[in-house]
Amino acid sequence: MLGSMAEPRRTRLTPEERRAQLLALGVAGLADRPLEALSLEDVSAEAGVSRGLMFYYFGSKQGFHREVVRVAGDSMLRATEPLTELPPLERLHDSLTRIVQFVRDHRGTFFSLVRGAASGDKEVREIVEGARGVHSARLARLFHDLGVEDSVLFTIALRSWVAFTEETLVAGALDTDMTIDEIVSFLERSLLAVLTVVDPAAERTLAQ
């Protein structure tokens, strides 16, 4: 079943509200099916609207899928927004904890986002890459706050670690009974190890 996030059937909604409702149902549908199995028929039936209305709002099944991925990615970014009032390393720990918790709570959504990176749809890939870029930028700000200097290798290391983290979350958070603390500790240590290779002078800063 898709989620129960829809308004009651035949409720008159504004176009903006209806579009948001259909996307919410699409994101909820990722809980028990992959993105490619998310059909316009199922979503329109759940919302109590015609299939033609789906085409009116999204143009095609692919257009709907793109917007579902965009909304799902935005929801993850909002849920894991760094708390800038925390000291940098505490901020890292808190953000990673909330990321792992999000993945555990929204397995299908996260898996669809990761799989979207390999999608044949260029726009879906761009949406996923955009979310990765936000995660990398957040990490860069955090380490700049610690005094770690920017460089080409620093940027490459952060983006590579984000991809590494995705695989760790799929394999560790979704496919094992590892605790959240165990996964977070592993990710913290791996990130700090990578950065000290890129910038050996950062080791003393990170150890403080």
Question: Where do the model's predicted regions map?
Answer:
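Hydrophobic alpha-helical connector segments
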Residues: 67, 81-107, 145, 157-161, ...
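N-terminal intrinsically disordered/low-complexity leader segments
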Residues: 1-17, 201-208
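Short, hydrophobic secondary-structure boundary micro-motifs
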Residues: 111-114, 181, 203-204
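Short secondary-structure transition hinges
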Residues: 104-140, 144, 170, 174-177
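Helix-turn-helix
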Residues: 21, 29-63, 67
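Amphipathic alpha-helical packing segments from all-alpha helical-bundle domains
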Residues: 77, 122-147, 152-163, 181-196
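Short glycine/proline-centered loop/turn elements that form peptide/ligand docking sites
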Residues: 6-10, 28, 37-39, 47, ...
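Short hydrophobic clusters on alpha-helical segments that form packing/core surfaces
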Residues: 18, 22-30, 53, 72, ...
